[in-house]
Design a protein with these regions (language model features):
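Binuclear metal-dependent hydrolase catalytic cores
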Residues: 1-56, 62-64, 108-109, 118-157
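Active-site-proximal loop/helix segments of hydrolase catalytic cores
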Residues: 40, 53-90
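Charged helix-capping and loop-helix junction motifs
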Residues: 90-100, 125-128
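Histidine-centered active-site/metal-ligand motif
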Residues: 36, 92-93, 114
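Hydrophobic beta-strand segments of well-ordered beta-sheets in folded domains
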Residues: 75-77, 107-112
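Short, conserved loop/helix-junction motifs that constitute active-site signature segments
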Residues: 70-73, 99-107, 134-135
Length: 157
């Protein structure tokens, strides 16, 4: 059974770190605003390990220059593509946004999450889309169980 009082008690013990930059162990981070509903306090993060490994994670967001500048300086970016092209919304990426970004940062891998697409070649029935956008080679559609490994120079999926 869900115990709301217990969760509220736990929530009060959390120390929120809201600095825009910092270091934790061997990881440095940058925190920056992204383009999404302001009520959820949307931020992206760029992480850099002392080994040279680095990545960006955006969470829910639509196109925004601050995110794209962080991606430009990174080996891989985990970005969402939450809506198909025909949806009129500003706070999520569409296929055309991803295509444009992939051309802008050809040396950065873009790992798509939170997509409206069913996984291509899935063993399950396709429910949401049978039409898959064609992207440049630096775009990867993430899937459950995907594993990213740093090989000392780049990320391998």
């Amino acid at each position: 059974m869900f115990d709301l009082d217990r969760w509220q008690e736990i929530f009060q013990t959390i120390s929120w770190i809201e600095e825009t930059t910092g270091t934790v162990n061997e990881w440095s981070f940058e925190r920056f605003k992204v383009n999404h509903d302001i009520s959820v306090d949307p931020h992206g993060y760029r992480l850099q390990h002392s080994s040279g490994a680095n990545l960006v994670h955006s969470g829910d967001t639509g196109p925004c220059e601050e995110l794209y500048q962080a991606i430009k300086r990174s080996n891989i970016a985990i970005v969402e593509m939450g809506v198909p092209e025909w949806v009129e919304i500003d706070g999520h990426h569409k296929p055309s946004h991803i295509e444009s970004l992939s051309q802008r940062v050809p040396d950065t891998k873009l790992l798509l999450t939170h997509t409206y697409l069913d996984m291509k070649d899935s063993e399950f029935e396709v429910l949401t889309s049978k039409d898959y956008p064609v992207f440049n080679d630096n775009v990867i559609h993430a899937y459950d169980g995907i594993c990213l490994k740093w090989n000392g120079q780049n990320w391998k999926a």
